Amino acid sequence: MKRFAIILSMLLCTISATGQTRAAKAEPRYAVVGLSSIYMRIAPDYESALETQELMGSVVEIIGEKSYWREIISPQPYKAWCTRMGLVEMNKEQLEEYQNAAKCMFIDLYGHVYETPSCEAQTICDLVGGDIMRLVGKGKAENFKPVTKGSWTKVLLPSGAEGWVKSECIKQHNGFRSIAKGEGNADSISDELMEKIIATAFKLKGVPYLWGGMTPKGVDCSGMVRWSHLMNGILLPRNASQMIHCGDEVSLDSLQRGDLVFFGNPAKDGKPQLVTHVGLYIGNGQIIHSSMLVRVNSMNPEESNYYENSHRLIAARRL
């Protein structure tokens, strides 16, 4: 009996070790966001707090699951939970094909993909600015020719469904440029591009504040800043506490249009600096930011639209 117990113990150890080896060699799981936006929550529960959102076309890694929830890591990068219905899981070959395909970005605030090239047709899904879709057509790279019909362009959704969008509402998408810490003037954003970013931010004016929001349906402070840059090909980190490390530090008395301005508590008495808010400087002492809603405020206390937390301005960065 003792001998049998020893043999059984050895067998169980072998099976356990084999299982661990297989788990260690498991291929990473990837998916593409298939809805106009997905809600990424702290825990796999609808009552859990919203952390952020990810837009259609983004590639994410699946690292866990619980029932119909999937724990993912997004490109922001951000780790959180979303429902499986918002994802289209792909194997290695499918993902490579997706990444190499010709794509477009939806550049209007809101819209739809239609079954046929008509606004009277049945909708397939909704869209928000920043959504990325594959183009249907022939050829590769600069020789690619999308399928069009009148003022419409044919697109392929992550789900595999084909549909039509208004051609004026999309532009070719060739990827994003990330802004790192202290890049200096060599890779800085041009004045022309910065004016486009500011104009994009103004498209959100009046949009309600939403904690974790990253779409024209609702944005938080860093969501507004990030979305305005993303729509113009610039990829910033998700949160204000991360953005403050991008670009170059700027003196608060030398602000220029397009600088990121940060509010919070300065480092004091051994406590580290705490960043609680970010906005986009637009000149003449004014900022556009998301606080209760996307609005324009002055940092001059003598102005009628004075931002009540202007005294908490702690830093600025130029990208």
Feature map (PLM): residue ranges:
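Bacterial Sec-dependent N-terminal signal peptides
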Residues: M1-E27
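Beta-loop motif signature
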Residues: V33-I62, F106-N143, Y209
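SH3/SH3-like beta-barrel fold
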Residues: G57, R70-S74, G130, T153-L157, ...
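Second-shell loop/turn segments in exported
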Residues: E120, E183-S188, P208-P216, K268
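Catalytic cysteine-centered active-site loop
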Residues: P208-R257
